[in-house]
Amino acid sequence: MVIFPEKRSSKSTADLSLISDDTWAVLSENDTLGFVVRAGEIYVALSGSDLHHAVEISQKHRFDEAVASVRRH
């Protein structure tokens, strides 16, 4: 899955988009920064704009920490 920035409104203030029951896209104004996937009690932070090719960058116990990892990477 690829989330195309040109399909999003530039006026959107959303930082996260739920794309499945356990997967969120982390968004900037113009780009998809990465994803957070819930795996049991762990949140896996992935970097990259394509979910199927994103690279794992961290695993966190808290959702907000996983999102912060994606934003920092």
Locate each region found by the language model.
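Short aromatic-glycine-(Arg/Gly/Cys) micro-motifs in beta-strand/loop hairpins
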Residues: G34-V55
